[in-house]
Every structure is written in structure tokens, then in C-alpha cells.
Amino acid sequence: MATPHINAEMGDFADVVLMPGDPLRAKFIAETFLDDAREVNNVRGMLGFTGTYKGRKISVMGHGMGIPSCSIYAKELITEFGVKKIIRVGSCGAVREDVKLRDVVIGMGACTDSKVNRMRFKDHDYAAIADFDMVRNAVDAAKARDVSVRVGNIFSADLFYTPDPQMFDVMEKYGILGVEMEAAGIYGVAAEFGAKALAICTVSDHIRTGAQTTSEERQTTFNEMIEIALESVLLGDNE
């Protein structure tokens, strides 16, 4: 049944949902990659669609910006609409010199300055990690398409405009591949409610150098990331 944030019914969503932050990006994915896509949510403009990819039913829906927003949608998709796997597809900023623009990053783990997972885990540190099989399938899908990917820790920040830029030094020291704002929350929600999750991000800018991709470059690399996500779903079905 419908929730306060999703006006869909059970069965409207596939068991796997791709989730970009931008709802218009969700619309683009549905129109570009899915066959027979239909709109299944439009509450607050957070568009969701369900269609098929190579005959496999798949959904895509925006999750907004930040852990509070994405946590609402992830939780409701899992508990109210039977979603089993969530793949976040978005952008991230790099802090390490060896991580370049347009690199595709697979978030094996997600560090965070948010307290949401401590709230879940009785004020202890919770290791927010992706599902191993989903990570492996994404890596295999990338290899099959001859796309180089980076696999490791990312950082989910609560603030886009940070008052503590020295934290980037710490991130670099600890090998953080990219900074974004949602993965740790999605991983925590998935763990709490018995689902699986993965974040795949494209490096759209470099925090250290100020370098940025052009809109055309972002579009091309974004498409590679989406193809990796979709193909990984098919690989998961064959396990």
C-alpha cells in the first residue's frame, strides 16, 4: 500500500531498484535503458519507474540528497514494497591524487560523519558495508565491458559545504576513494531490514585540485556506471 512518500502498490516495484539522487536522472535512466517503463511514484517529485532490462524487471527511483532523505525511501521500499536489493548510482568527489575524474568507484564500505548508524547500533560503531555478491557482480560486469573500476572505502558526509576541510587529509591518509552523501545510510537501512545494497559512483570532481568533468563527460561516464549496475543485476540472477 502507499506510504506518505511513495504512492505505489505492492508489485509496482521490482525486487531490485537503482537509486540516483536526482529524480530527473531516474527518469533519464528509465527512458534510456528500460523497456516499457511506467511511472510508479511521483510524491514530492521523487520520480520512480518500473520497466525491464533485457527482459528482467527492474525499477529506478530517486532518493534525494543526504542520508535522512535516502533512508526514508530505502526503508519504505524494503519494508512496504518488497525490494530486496538497492543499487545507489551517483557521483562522488575524489580526495586522493591517484583517483581521477571519470573513475567509477564501487563502495565496498562507507565511512561517515553521520550518527545514524550509531543510533541503530546502540551507540557502537557499525561497519557499513556493501553486499559481497553485489560488489563481485559489479566488478565482473565492469570487466566484461572493459571499464576500469576502483573498489574500496568511500565517505558519506552529512554536510556538502564542510566547515572542516582538514578532514580531507584524514580521508586521503585512510585511502578513501570518494566522498558522497548517502551510501552509509543506505547500507545501514539494508542491514537493519534484511535487504542488500551497493553504491556505484562516478568521480565527477576532484576536491583537492578543483577539477571538474564537463556535462558531456558526466553523461558518458554515468551511462557506463548505469550499464555496470544493470548488468550486475543479471549476473546476480545467474548465481
Swiss-Prot record:
InterPro entries: DeoD-type, Nucleoside_phosphorylase_CS, Nucleoside_phosphorylase_d, Nucleoside_phosphorylase_sf
Reaction catalyzed: a purine D-ribonucleoside + phosphate = a purine nucleobase + alpha-D-ribose 1-phosphate; a purine 2'-deoxy-D-ribonucleoside + phosphate = a purine nucleobase + 2-deoxy-alpha-D-ribose 1-phosphate
Membrane-spanning intervals of the chain: none
Domain of life where this protein originates: Bacteria
Site (Important for catalytic activity): 218
GO biological process: purine nucleoside catabolic process
Residue numbers binding a purine D-ribonucleoside: 5, 180-182, 204-205
Keywords: Glycosyltransferase, Transferase
Pfam families: PNP_UDP_1 (PF01048)
CDD domains tied to this protein: PNP_EcPNPI-like (cd09006)
Molecular function GO terms recorded: purine-nucleoside phosphorylase activity
Active site residues of this protein: 205 (proton donor)
Binding, phosphate: 21, 25, 44, 88-91
Quaternary organization: Homohexamer; trimer of homodimers.
Family affiliation: Belongs to the PNP/UDP phosphorylase family.
General function of this protein: Catalyzes the reversible phosphorolytic breakdown of the N-glycosidic bond in the beta-(deoxy)ribonucleoside molecules, with the formation of the corresponding free purine bases and pentose-1-phosphate.
PANTHER family: PURINE NUCLEOSIDE PHOSPHORYLASE DEOD-TYPE, URIDINE PHOSPHORYLASE
Protein name: Purine nucleoside phosphorylase DeoD-type
Biological classification of the source: Bacteria, Pseudomonadati, Pseudomonadota, Gammaproteobacteria, Enterobacterales
